[in-house]
């Protein structure tokens, strides 16, 4: 009986490391984003309109740790930008929830909330936030490679 070309070889699939790294990489990127969103939301709700140095240090430390866990330079670079995009999207959605659910009445008031949230994210993430997240991930990957 001839073997179909589309038939999977289970033993080679089980021995392939990249197959099992994919869910781990996705989980790390999501966790990286959620922690970054937590830091940004704390600043948005309690710390005012300026991001102090210790919040930037937290963003950098989380990125170093995520880069050390990810290990692969390609996963770190792509994952850093994916985490950054997911962070911005999640933080923006969380900031505009009152306008989305109708707690803020009036078209102009809703647009004001959307504009304030976008302005806050722009001030917090561009350019220093992006640089800290990407460079922190790269440094974490380099540290992990150097320590092993």
Spans of model-derived segments:
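Canonical alpha-helical transmembrane segments
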Residues: 56-80
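Membrane-interfacial segments
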Residues: 43, 47-48, 74, 94, ...
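Hydrophobic alpha-helical membrane-insertion segments
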Residues: 74-97
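Hydrophobic alpha-helical transmembrane segments
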Residues: 75, 116-139
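Membrane-interfacial helical/loop segments at transmembrane boundaries in membrane proteins
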Residues: 101-120
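N-terminal signal-anchor transmembrane alpha-helix
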Residues: 2-55
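Short, charged juxtamembrane terminal tails flanking transmembrane helices
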Residues: 1-9, 141-148
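Alpha-helical transmembrane segments of multipass membrane proteins
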Residues: 32-40, 86-91, 132, 136, ...
């Amino acid at each position: 009986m001839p073997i179909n070309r589309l038939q999977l070889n289970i033993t080679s699939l089980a021995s392939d490391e990249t197959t099992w790294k994919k869910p781990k990489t996705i989980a790390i990127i999501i966790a990286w984003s959620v922690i970054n969103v937590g830091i940004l939301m704390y600043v948005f709700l309690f710390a005012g309109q300026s991001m102090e140095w210790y919040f930037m240090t937290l963003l950098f430390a989380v990125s170093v740790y995520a880069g050390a866990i990810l290990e692969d330079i390609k996963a770190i670079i792509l994952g850093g930008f994916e985490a950054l995009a997911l962070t911005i999207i999640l933080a923006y959605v969380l900031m505009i929830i009152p306008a989305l659910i109708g707690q803020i009445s009036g078209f102009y008031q809703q647009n004001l909330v959307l504009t304030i949230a976008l302005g806050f994210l722009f001030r917090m993430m561009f350019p220093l936030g992006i640089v800290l997240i990407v460079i922190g991930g790269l440094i974490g990957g380099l540290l992990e490679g150097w320590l092993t």
